[in-house]
Amino acid sequence: MLFAAALSAQEAKYLSSTEIRAEFDKLAKAEPDWCKIEELPGKVFGLYAVRLARHKEPVNRPAIVVLGSLRGDELSPALACLEMARAMLVRAKPDLPVRFGAWLQVVEVIFIPTPCASSRDLVLGAKPTAVAGVLAPLDDDRDLATDEDGLEDVNGDGVISQLRIKRQGGRYRVSSRDVCALIECAPGELGAYDLIWEGFDNDGDGQINEDPRGSITLANDFAIRWSDKQPGANRFPMLTAESRALADFFVAHPNISAAINLRSLGGALTVAGGQPQAPEAPAGRGRRTPPQGDGARDKQVGDALQKLFVENTGYKPRQGEEPESEGAGNVADWLYEACGAYAMNYYLARLPEPEKGDKPPREENPPTKDEAAQLEWLKHAPEDYLEWKSFKHATLGDVEIGGWKAVARRDVKPAHAIEAATKALDFLWALCDATARLRITKLEAKDLGDGTFKIRLTLSNEGALDYKPQHAAQSRIGLPLWVTLVEDKKIELVSGARRQSAENINGGATATFEWVVRAKDPFDFMKFKVEGERCMPLEESKSPKGCEEWKE
């Protein structure tokens, strides 16, 4: 979590969605054994999966998916995805002393870098503007026309910025700390200005920007505690081609055990934990009592993920800093509750903290959160702010145009995104290491006489994460794990199901499976198979006499 120091003269730049795809295509061409690109269902522009694994060995593996932000006004996550993939493939080459080469044989990493491709490209357009969601024509003012009255470059300076109207009792006041910052007044406080984005009254209804370019916030379009009151909500959830394509891909790939939703600006890692528990209702007929310890195990895993995050990024919490809220219907909650995957939001950067030596003395009226954020952005990115200039507006008369650009205060600089990707890659590496990895660690036999043996197989999870979250196990999300004693004429099954299942195996824990068999020759081999949606296929063969001695 960082902002880099001063940038070099050769500053990095953000790439369009088409350019991002072209760079991934180059990686796939250069490293066909490690990198494959798969179009998501529906063939929506910008929606594809970059799959990194040892593709020469096409076996099922647990997978971690990295999403390049579901907000169209954030550019840095897609660039970070590209930089992370590049670094992983360099490290995965077998002729280098690397760590990722071994992991990509047992874990698959999937990047979906540009879920909101069309919207993010507007930020890079000739007259940049920011749209948070996927583009969708909407009639916001119910005049039977769509998107006809939105932001425009009124003064022709090539930039869309703010427009302020001087009015006694207006909604905004000038900051006493810096005249560049306009602060929304507290209730009962009289301001000096009204503030809007640049625009005209294009449809002659007396309003400005009341029907801008329509969009649906993809980040909150998923059917989990969805709300039509959420800003940018559609009429119903998951009606967009983008949300359907993502959902279809996730459902078709149940091996996805963890997901990272990369975001641009924020604070600490947030881990999806399900619906907050409501206060317990009075005892009564028909009331369901939740099982004891409901969600406790997933909270433990969430705490472990937070620890991994701090250890691998150097993140230091700040006083008064609260976790970011992703709102209703967000993708992380949906992945956790509907798909049974550990899901988290990872923020590449946060606002720079004032240097300790520059801290002002304790104030009676400290700045509001928005005021403090504006003041820090003025220090960090003064080029995103324009001086106010007088202008004669066709509808509003004498106004001033300037202030913040429409695309300001949403993203880190490209060089910062590339540097932040290094920290994100360290966290991704730690997550690969923590992912559930199953191994047959022991086969034991007890001689019951007359060629009969009691057999016990021990299956261990050598990762820190559970095979699936506790919520998935309690909700009966279908992620079966099967252990089979393969049928063989030489080995007769006396008791025990030939194919047995385990609901879950916690990180660092074991599960045991037992059979009673009869062998004509105690040195004949038995064959065992382990199969699951989130594990590599495992096989083990041993004779009853070749097994370890049974220990009670």
Predicted stretch roles:
Residues 36, 46-48, 67, 109, ...:
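Metallocarboxypeptidase
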Residues 9-47, 417-419:
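Short glycine- and acidic-rich boundary segments immediately preceding or forming the N-terminal edge
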Residues 460-464, 520-522, 533:
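Short solvent-exposed strand-capping/beta-turn motif centered on an Asx-Ser/Thr pair
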Residues 42, 501-509:
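Short proline/glycine- and polar residue-rich coil/turn motifs
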Residues 459-474:
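Short amphipathic, basic-aromatic surface patches that mediate peripheral association
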Residues 60-63, 75-79, 83-294:
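Active-site/substrate-binding loop(s) of hydrolase catalytic cores
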Residues 522-552:
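Terminal connector regions
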Residues 513-521:
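Short, hydrophobic beta-strand segments
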